[in-house]
Amino acid sequence: MKNVKTLIAAAILSSMSFASFAAVEVQSTPEGQQKVGTISANAGTNLGSLEEQLAQKADEMGAKSFRITSVTGPNTLHGTAVIYK
């Protein structure tokens, strides 16, 4: 039982510290950061879901921030974003 509690506490703490390093969505080019690439993602009809997928891809690429540059599609949304480091 003690191991289960320790495991749960470790999982919660690791997710909290990981979130502090997550890429941040920005509205313009961040000062002191450079464009390092672009990413794209497809989602359902929910804009929030598309934003989450783009944020996850930005994190995987090691970006500090990302800026969504386009969103298209009436049924399945497709979005692109510029990533910065």
From Swiss-Prot:
<feature type="signal peptide">
    <location>
        <begin position="1"/>
        <end position="22"/>
    </location>
</feature>
<dbReference type="InterPro" id="IPR010854">
    <property type="entry name" value="YdgH/BhsA/McbA-like_dom"/>
</dbReference>
<keyword id="KW-0346">Stress response</keyword>
<dbReference type="GO" id="GO:0044010">
    <property type="term" value="P:single-species biofilm formation"/>
</dbReference>
<dbReference type="InterPro" id="IPR051096">
    <property type="entry name" value="BhsA/McbA_stress_biofilm_assoc"/>
</dbReference>
<keyword id="KW-0472">Membrane</keyword>
<dbReference type="GO" id="GO:0046688">
    <property type="term" value="P:response to copper ion"/>
</dbReference>
<comment type="similarity">
    <text>Belongs to the BhsA/McbA family.</text>
</comment>
<protein>
    <recommendedName>
        <fullName>Multiple stress resistance protein BhsA</fullName>
    </recommendedName>
</protein>
<dbReference type="GO" id="GO:0009279">
    <property type="term" value="C:cell outer membrane"/>
</dbReference>
<dbReference type="InterPro" id="IPR025543">
    <property type="entry name" value="Dodecin-like"/>
</dbReference>
<dbReference type="InterPro" id="IPR036275">
    <property type="entry name" value="YdgH-like_sf"/>
</dbReference>
<keyword id="KW-0186">Copper</keyword>
<keyword id="KW-0732">Signal</keyword>
<comment type="function">
    <text>Reduces the permeability of the outer membrane to copper. Seems to be involved in the regulation of biofilm formation. May decrease biofilm formation by repressing cell-cell interaction and cell surface interaction.</text>
</comment>
<dbReference type="GO" id="GO:0006950">
    <property type="term" value="P:response to stress"/>
</dbReference>
<dbReference type="Pfam" id="PF07338">
    <property type="entry name" value="YdgH_BhsA-like"/>
</dbReference>
<keyword id="KW-0998">Cell outer membrane</keyword>
